[in-house]
Amino acid sequence: MRVIEAALPLPLVRRSRDAIVRIGSERLRQSYFTTFWLPRGAVPAHAVEEAVLALWRLAGARRCDGAEWWLGRAYTTDIPVEFHFDQDVRGRRRRHPRLSSVFFFNSVRGGQLAVTDQVPAGRAAMRLETVAPRRNRYAIFAGNLLHGVLDARGLTPGKRVQGPRGRLRLTLVVNYWDRRPTGVPTWSESGVYRGLGGRRRSRLR
């Protein structure tokens, strides 16, 4: 895994964060499953896609066909995703991105990105690397590795953690693919998160 500190220019980080604030709580529980496609050579539609293009250059995935991106929004007391492999979930054959990556917008209690050395159909994981959420930190790893998000205690998530939910963990997840994953729309095609383009909704809490 490769970790880059101070990955993006701060004005771009702020504009991207402001755009995300505009969508409020839209699809908050489904945010990890609301993904978009940005083809190579595309003109960004808003600040978040500008950030995707900037991260793409840092990742070095120059020959990829495009980037699949989504907003990872969750409270670390109630993580909505288990450990998993990134893959073309609607495709007929198992296919993984060339690279997976996570950009962090803020620091939170727990919420570490955890990446194992386990690959599909391989032996069980023998090694685990973690990256704590910090503003403007960017983590890049091979797209076929088992990974997940730890909870507020820094443990594998299970039941909801009791106590105050704390700050919302906010990330931009970008996967780089040799070919477009099946059925993933562009942001313009999707009809969701219109606030990213400028129309304001209720603020995130």
Each PLM stretch: what is its role?
Residues 1-70, 77-80:
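Non-heme Fe(II)/2-oxoglutarate
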Residues 63-68, 72-197:
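Catalytic core of non-heme Fe(II) oxygenases with the double-stranded beta-helix
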Residues 201-205:
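Eukaryotic intrinsically disordered, low-complexity regulatory regions
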